[in-house]
């Protein structure tokens, strides 16, 4: 439940902020503080605009990854892991929605809306924050809650059985 709630919440936050960016930043840049500004861009590639000619393949790959994460999401044992996977899935889906439906050229031909600009880092969006921070949290969750080793539990069972005889 937590995994799904985080994923849905992240998609909604991402799409609402992109809606705001598209409606408010068409011909404008808003300086927020220091080097942070909001500036509307469309990214037809992956991270850092790499692979701009492969938008359809990037979209298909993202859908496959989301499918795998949703499948694995049901078996997550920790709350932190559930939040992390929810952020990754929500972020990936937010960007896939842009690719799928923000295009005049056809399905999965659209560009991802990016608008958060620090001027010293590539422009990004809320979905990107979910994917990156979710991945970091997933690593932390994995380090804090390692999967039990099947050979360890089998070894404990057999040694306790041997000791009791």
Kindly give the residue locations of the regions a language model identified:
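Alpha-helical transmembrane bundles and membrane-interface segments of multipass inner-membrane proteins
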Residues: 1-165
């Amino acid at each position: 439940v937590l995994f799904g709630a985080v994923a849905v919440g992240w998609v909604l936050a991402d799409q609402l902020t992109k809606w705001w960016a598209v409606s408010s930043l068409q011909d404008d840049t808003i300086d927020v503080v220091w080097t942070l500004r909001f500036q509307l861009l469309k990214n037809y590639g992956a991270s850092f605009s790499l692979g701009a000619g492969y938008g359809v393949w990037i979209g298909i790959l993202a859908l496959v990854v989301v499918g795998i994460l949703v499948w694995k999401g049901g078996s997550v044992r920790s709350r932190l892991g559930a939040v992390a996977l929810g952020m990754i899935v929500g972020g990936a889906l937010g960007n896939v929605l842009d690719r799928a439906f923000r295009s005049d050229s056809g399905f999965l031909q659209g560009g991802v809306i990016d608008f958060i600009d620090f001027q010293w880092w590539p422009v990004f969006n809320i979905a990107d924050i979910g994917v990156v921070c979710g991945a970091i949290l997933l690593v932390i969750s994995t380090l804090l809650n390692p999967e039990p080793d099947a050979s360890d539990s089998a070894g404990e069972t057999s040694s306790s059985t041997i000791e009791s005889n």
